[in-house]
Amino acid sequence: MAALRVSLVTLSDFAVRTASTAALAPMILFIVWIGEWVFFLLLLTSIVLLASEWNRLTGGSGAAFSNMTFVVLAGGSLASAWFFGYIEALVVVAAAVGVEALLAWRKKRNVPFAAFGPIYIIVPLLALMWLRGQPVVGIGSVVWLFLVVWSTDIFAYLIGGTLHSAKLAPSISPGKTWAGLIGGVTCAGLAGGIAGAYLLSIEAFVFETWSTGIQLGIFIGVTAQIGDLGESWLKRLRMLKDSGRIIPGHGGLLDRVDGLMTSAPMMAVLVWVVG
């Protein structure tokens, strides 16, 4: 009965998650398709929310204006990439690392967390902006990445919650299981292959075969799961259930995109190497 109760709760939570994703996904994909300043505004809005949630999770630098400083620097890095270039944007990221570390040191806060924040929050969104800006394959690369990460996230949660296998990392995230990890990564591979095959048919996929899509889907699925586990560790450390409350069934925005934060830079590197 207890196992049945857990399964019903899991399915109920899954229904809320699925409804949230179903409502948001078409809008996000439409914005990716439009690109240009609309996609830039989506990233800019996201980075403001993510910077605020990161400060909530880690305590930030401890300065009275810590949140505002981080938000301004994070937004400034995206604006630098948009108006000037990615080298200039990375200079702003480096400046943000220095400022956050200095403020944390002065307030005797956790300097490594404060310094890592700009890298963790800003670089993935710069990677998404760079990916979308690639000629011909830009839209396909971002759409493929989103579909793979969404697949591993949804099916890891569903499979892990229903099969009740051995715990993956009980001291970090008691709800995560080996079945969820394997199921989520497998579904990421399938999504990568299917999406890759379609994108190849319209010449919008950067890689040459659909089987490469499967292999990369598995790889991105693993990196997304690592990102999910990393955020779970941080929440456990700070004794918080969610990074925020903005998305029903998911908590904060960071809870929804934690896998994307690790997989987007990896995808950008792969596309850069192939290109």
Task: Report each predicted region and the residues it spans.
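Hydrophobic side chains within alpha-helical segments
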Residues: S20, R56, A156, E231-L234, ...
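Juxtamembrane boundary at the C-terminal end of a transmembrane helix
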Residues: A268-G275
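Membrane-embedded alpha-helical bundles of polytopic integral membrane proteins
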Residues: M1-I218
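Hydrophobic transmembrane alpha-helical segments of multi-pass transport and channel proteins
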Residues: I218-I226, L253-M261
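Interfacial loop-to-transmembrane junctions
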Residues: R236-G259
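Short helical (or helix-break) motifs at transmembrane helix termini and adjacent helical loops
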Residues: S151-G161, A224-R236
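Re-entrant/interfacial helical elements at transmembrane boundaries that shape
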Residues: G161-T162, L234-R238, M261, M266
